[in-house]
Amino acid sequence: MKRAYVNVWFLIGGLCILCSTIFAQQSAPRVVVRAGHLLDTKSGKTLVNQAIVIEGGKIVSVGPIAEVKTAAGDQIIELPQATVLPGLIDAHTHLDEGPENHGYPGLAVSVPRHALIGARNARATLEAGFTTIRNVGADGFSDVALRDAINAGEIPGPRMLVSGPALSITGGHCDNNLLPFEYHATGDGVADGIAAVQHKVRENIKYGADLIKVCATGGVLSQGDDPQASQYTLEEMRAIVADAHRLGRRVCIRRRE
């Protein structure tokens, strides 16, 4: 049973990569995927022997294999042993991070390296069946570069909504708190006071952010802050949200219970 489950996920990943390739090639022929099983998330049922028709990079119809007619030139993909389901969504990711990024070793990881780590993780995420993700916090806008490369068809990966650097108070969860004073190290998203947080929101949007990420409390992996303590004031938070909404962006808040 375990082996069959793993095989299903590999097939799902393969189908995701196929769809990603189709998106980049709008002139591709019509694709008909014949699946042994299809998870219908609306009804909560698993349907058998279903055909998925893809035209111009979009799914245009789904129905029983016996009822879907094919034509000369169609690309037929036979997956009789596979279970196909809609692409999964992960609303909290950091694709530009890995084991090499955490703690003091992470201080040696450059922004270009962050982007390359992101390319590796983007492919793995797509192959795991996730076709849309929200990346909430990345140094140097490496997530923006990754999103743009995926959208341009240069590398495989899911659709990405990205925040750029997360906003933080000085010494907060998303500041750089590992180095001593003489290095004057500061996180990319640090901003204190109403005028400063408004500027940071606008700066993130200027450089390509789809949303704004805010570290509203301390965290368990940052040094010197309390995970239970509020960091931004209510007035600062209101200023962040108001400016982001005025500019057509949503705000994602990171907080501990």
Each model region followed by its residue ranges:
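Metal-associated gating/positioning segment near the N- to mid-region
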Residues: 82-154, 170-173, 177-180, 235, ...
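Boundary at the C-terminal end of the N-terminal hydrophobic targeting segment
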Residues: 22-26
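Surface-exposed loop and adjacent secondary-structure segments within mature catalytic domains
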Residues: 159-162, 166-179, 206
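Histidine-rich, glycine-flanked metal-binding segment
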Residues: 38, 44-85
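Divalent metal-coordination and catalytic microenvironments
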Residues: 36, 52, 57, 81, ...
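Bacterial N-terminal signal peptides
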Residues: 8-21
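N-terminal secretory signal peptides that target proteins for export/translocation
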Residues: 1-7
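Histidine/acidic residue-rich metal-binding segments in metalloenzymes
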Residues: 145, 196-257
